[in-house]
């Protein structure tokens, strides 16, 4: 376990951090995937600021041939996962903001969260016709067919798109609000493996987990499943070009995990599920950003006392 930084163990630890019960394996990173052929055709460059992002979206929309922003709200979870949790860390400053929510010193009614929903609401004019009925597979198909320019993504989408030989794509990280601002990424702890202490195969399982924790496993895993990134501190040569782009953001951006996962997902109403519905409603124009913050904070206050 010496191959893993403390931050990579959080998803598989007791709250006091004293007991780790899984070997961390991999994370997924959020960002935006774009069709490079469309960008070349329209003479666009990947945006680095929110203003540049909207300028690019305006140009794609004005051209009229492609859906500018390929995301739907029918399934709801995409609105939270590839929307709110993708761009939000830029506004609430990653781990600082996430930990402040847990401590109760920040609320969903604060400006960083309202500003995140305001930005999500501004996406609507760039999304496809009927996006309210568009499901996750619909979004994937639209991008795969070359009919959409920008796809709010998780790195787990890379293998799906790479099955299409004719599709050329790349990625850019969530744009910052102002040029020169610190960039943030959601580098979500995704999976680990634990050992049942009552297993009849303890020795064999320990041998396997020792390998799972090794640099050699990390190297195999990173290239066998592009878009799922090893959590060990081993230096890995990721060969997939788009996965390599996503991974490179760890060097320039500060990483965080989704703010609805650690501790705050334990009560009722469930914060993760509430975020789905609230974010989808904001993107549908059915809920104002201020109202979204009030609703989410009120739901959290029903069971999470530090938030009061």
Regions found by a protein language model. Give the residues of each.
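Hinge/lid segment of periplasmic solute-binding proteins
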Residues: 1-30, 54, 84, 170-172
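Glycine-centered hinge/linker elements that transmit conformational signals in sensory
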Residues: 57-59, 63, 102-132
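Short helices/loops that flank or line small-molecule/ion binding pockets
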Residues: 38-39, 55-63, 137-151, 277, ...
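C-terminal capping/gating helix-and-loop segments adjacent to ligand/active sites or protein-protein/ligand interfaces
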Residues: 24, 101, 186, 229-231, ...
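Mature extracytoplasmic/periplasmic domains
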Residues: 145, 156-160, 174, 191-269, ...
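Extracytoplasmic "Venus flytrap"/periplasmic binding protein-like
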Residues: 1-7, 37-48, 142, 149-150, ...
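Short, solvent-exposed loop/beta-turn-alpha elements that line the ligand-binding surface or hinge
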Residues: 1-4, 89-115, 163-164, 176-184, ...
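Extracytoplasmic/periplasmic substrate-binding proteins
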Residues: 86, 118-201
